[in-house]
Amino acid sequence: MKNLQTFVIALPLLIVSSMASAVSVSGNIALTSDYIWRGMTQSAGGPAVAGGFDLSTDSGFYIGTWGSSVQFSDGTAVETTELELDVYLGYSTDIADNISLDVGYITYTYPGATDANFDEAYIGFDIYGFGISYAAGIDGAADYVSVGYGIDAGPGSFSIAYGDYENTSNDFLIGYDWGVGGDFGIGVYYYDLEMEDGAGDSGVTLTISYAP
């Protein structure tokens, strides 16, 4: 944990020093029938609009921001906001054939409800389509561990994932994504959530995305 935090603290300096290599900029926007995050709705079961921008270097360093409309009704501080805005930076690279590493730091912010803000340091591996990731919550925030698998299937790709949110919940996700009309994509996902207190939720979401 300390080694992971030490590395991500040094990431800004590493990114600046790597700017001499080629830099690319990308963006994305999406409309979803329900914004599901770790099995939990972030839009009160309704639609949400999201989008973001990323800057990456040939050497593997990246920095980006992502935002989404949100809607909460649980009586907590986040109920007072209708926006989530995340900022992240990291490093991604292939460490062997069909094996890749991604490590970074992300800040989740909710303008107007700063008590809900939290940070995570994360690390993930993709090994022949199997993924495993660990997000360490900072300053008392809960940790999250997930495993999954993705494979090309027909005109798109199939994915399945399971996650454990420390002292909070377990979630399961299965989905299919495919490209339509060049830069447009469609995704259909089934999610299932089990809270630590025994409550739960499940459903199907539809997402339309554009990433030029």
Where are these regions (language model features)?
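Outer-membrane beta-barrel proteins
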Residues: 2-10, 16-212
